[in-house]
Amino acid sequence: MNLAQRISEVPDIYEHSNRSTAALLKETGYLEAPQALTVGDVEEALEQDPNLAELWLERGMDQRLAGGWGIECVHGQYRIQSYANGRHLVEKDRLHACAEFIVRYVGFIGEVVRRHQRARMR
């Protein structure tokens, strides 16, 4: 199983465990190689199991974190939004939009974890 497949399964594992998203991302290996996660690879993983995309979309519609990313569907278009700076992109394809959101969302969580780890080392 590659990194994109492991990341794609995070919401499902989260729902059936008592582990945090940060802990699950660490278990996937993402924190050691965040650059290895690409939109194309995530989109392929979602094509293999489209139900995972639905879990991510549900999670993304719940996100209103300062600095984080969210996703919503309006009139058949998906808006991926940064709550840090208002940047956004709009996609029509559901799986591609979801993949774009996932890469940005886990990137944000990964950066928060790295900042926390650096602060603890001081």
For each feature predicted by the language model, list its residue ranges.
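Short N-terminal micro-motifs specific to bacterial/archaeal maturation
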Residues: 33, 88-89
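Negatively charged, low-complexity tracts enriched in Asp/Glu with abundant Ser/Thr
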Residues: 1-61
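Short aromatic-glycine-(Arg/Gly/Cys) micro-motifs in beta-strand/loop hairpins
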Residues: 59-87
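Intrinsically disordered, low-complexity charged/polar segments
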Residues: 110-122
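Amphipathic alpha-helical interaction surfaces
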Residues: 48, 52, 73-77, 103, ...
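Conserved aromatic
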Residues: 36, 91-92
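A short, charged, amphipathic alpha-helix used as a generic interaction element across diverse proteins
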Residues: 92-105
